[in-house]
């Protein structure tokens, strides 16, 4: 009953059916792709999902062929159309995700304009990164709670700031209050 050939993202149930799932790179959660009769069809479903999530750099079970007529990638499979699979994956991700728009927040230094601040990038290909809090380095210290137009729309109150954001803000304040060797001056917030 158990076949020796192993595919990425595919496993066999005790009663013989094959299941496929993939891990989302940002959410770090498994996305259930379905139950299949054969390991090959489950592997092809995984491949389609991997290409949708990661594009050309996806690690797949079968070779990915780049279409001549368009920039899309094709897998030798007739499981589902890429559009219907994309809609299915989006629906599953929305269901699994507590926060509808997951994001990455980090402390970032902008050397070009001498700024330091909290930088945020929301998940998705159509979103642009933005500054949540920006502080100019040097003699003049200027804190901008909104950052840019997008963040001005999302006024963040102190009681709504999550623990991670509070820690990032604390790190910025500690860095700004740190005395640089050789400078002799302390920046104040």
Curated annotation (Swiss-Prot):
<dbReference type="GO" id="GO:0003677">
    <property type="term" value="F:DNA binding"/>
</dbReference>
<comment type="similarity">
    <text>Belongs to the AP2/ERF transcription factor family. ERF subfamily.</text>
</comment>
<comment type="function">
    <text>Promotes cuticle formation by inducing the expression of enzymes involved in wax biosynthesis. Probably acts as a transcriptional activator. Binds to the GCC-box pathogenesis-related promoter element. May be involved in the regulation of gene expression by stress factors and by components of stress signal transduction pathways.</text>
</comment>
<keyword id="KW-0805">Transcription regulation</keyword>
<dbReference type="GO" id="GO:0009873">
    <property type="term" value="P:ethylene-activated signaling pathway"/>
</dbReference>
<feature type="DNA-binding region" description="AP2/ERF">
    <location>
        <begin position="6"/>
        <end position="63"/>
    </location>
</feature>
<dbReference type="GO" id="GO:0003700">
    <property type="term" value="F:DNA-binding transcription factor activity"/>
</dbReference>
<dbReference type="InterPro" id="IPR001471">
    <property type="entry name" value="AP2/ERF_dom"/>
</dbReference>
<protein>
    <recommendedName>
        <fullName>Ethylene-responsive transcription factor SHINE 3</fullName>
    </recommendedName>
</protein>
<keyword id="KW-0238">DNA-binding</keyword>
<dbReference type="InterPro" id="IPR036955">
    <property type="entry name" value="AP2/ERF_dom_sf"/>
</dbReference>
<keyword id="KW-0936">Ethylene signaling pathway</keyword>
<keyword id="KW-0539">Nucleus</keyword>
<keyword id="KW-0346">Stress response</keyword>
<dbReference type="InterPro" id="IPR016177">
    <property type="entry name" value="DNA-bd_dom_sf"/>
</dbReference>
<dbReference type="GO" id="GO:0005634">
    <property type="term" value="C:nucleus"/>
</dbReference>
<dbReference type="InterPro" id="IPR050913">
    <property type="entry name" value="AP2/ERF_ERF_subfamily"/>
</dbReference>
<keyword id="KW-0010">Activator</keyword>
<keyword id="KW-0804">Transcription</keyword>
<dbReference type="Pfam" id="PF00847">
    <property type="entry name" value="AP2"/>
</dbReference>
């Amino acid at each position: 009953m158990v076949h020796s050939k192993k595919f990425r993202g595919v496993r066999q149930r005790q009663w013989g059916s094959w299941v496929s799932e993939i891990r989302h790179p940002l959410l770090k959660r498994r996305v259930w792709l379905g139950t299949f009769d054969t390991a090959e069809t489950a592997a092809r479903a995984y491949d389609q999902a991997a290409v949708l999530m990661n594009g050309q750099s996806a690690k797949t079970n079968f070779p990915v062929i780049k279409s001549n007529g368009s920039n899309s990638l094709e897998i030798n499979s007739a499981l589902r159309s890429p559009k219907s699979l994309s809609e299915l994956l989006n629906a599953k991700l929305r269901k699994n995700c507590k926060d509808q728009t997951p994001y990455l927040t980090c402390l970032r230094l902008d050397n070009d304009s001498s700024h330091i601040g909290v930088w945020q990038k929301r998940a998705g290909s159509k979103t642009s990164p933005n500054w949540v809090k920006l502080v100019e380095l040097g003699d003049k210290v200027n804190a901008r709670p909104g950052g840019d137009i997008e963040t001005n729309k999302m006024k963040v109150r102190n009681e709504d700031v999550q623990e991670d954001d509070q820690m990032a803000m604390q790190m910025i304040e500690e860095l700004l209050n740190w005395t640089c060797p050789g400078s002799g001056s302390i920046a104040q917030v």
